[in-house]
Amino acid sequence: MARTRASKSLVDRVYEYLLDQIITGAIRYGDTISIKGMAGRLSVSSMPVREALKRLEFEGVVDIKPRSSCTVRVPSRRTILEVYALREALEVYALSCCGGRFPRASLARMEGIVARMRALGKEQDPVEKEKKAIALDREFHGEICALAGNDLLNATYRQLTLRVNMTLMHEKTFHTMEEDWAKMHADVLSCLQKDPVRAVGLLRSHFAGATEIWKKNGGTARA
C-alpha cells in the first residue's frame, strides 16, 4: 500500500508540473510532449508521466498518440469565448460574495501587482515584458477569484486557465491594450477600494474590451 500511495503521489506531482507548464505558457497549445523526454526531464520513470497525461486527456487538454507522445490541444474559437465568459462570471461572483467589503490583505497584494504592472513600462525587452505581463495578469485575476474564499471556485478557475491560458489571450490583445493595460487594472482596484458597486461594471467592461480586441486581432477561426 505504501508503494501505491507513493506512486500516486508521484503521478500527482507530475500532473501538477504539467498543469503549471501549460497554464504559464511554457508548454504551448499544439506542442508535442514526449513521454520519454518528460520522464527524463523530471528524473522519473515513464509510468507517472503516462498516467498524468491520461488525466489531462480525460480533461480534454491533450491527445495521446502512439509512439509515446501526445499533443496539447489547440482550443477552438468557441472554447476560448466560452472560457472567457466563464472567467468573467466567476470573478463577478467572487466580488458579490464580499458584499462590498474586501480583505485589506487582498487589496494590498493587488496594489503590489498593479505597482509591478506600472513598473513594467520601463522594461526594454519586449519578450520579457510580455512574459511578465502575462504572469501579473494571472496574479491579479487570481486574487479577484480568491476574494470569494471558495476552494472549488479557485479550482474551477485554474481549470479554465488550463484550457485557455493568459498567454493565448495576450498574443492577440496585449500589443493593442499595452498603453492602457496597467491603468485598466488600477481602475478596477480603485473601485474595489472606493466604489465596490461600480467595480462589477468595470470588470465586465474590462472583459468585454479584451474579447473584442481578441476578435479584431485575428482570434483563432476554428469553430
Residue ranges of predicted features:
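Residue-level recognition of alpha-helical structural elements
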Residues: 79, 103-106, 125-133, 149, ...
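C-terminal all-alpha effector/ligand-binding and dimerization domain
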Residues: 118, 169-223
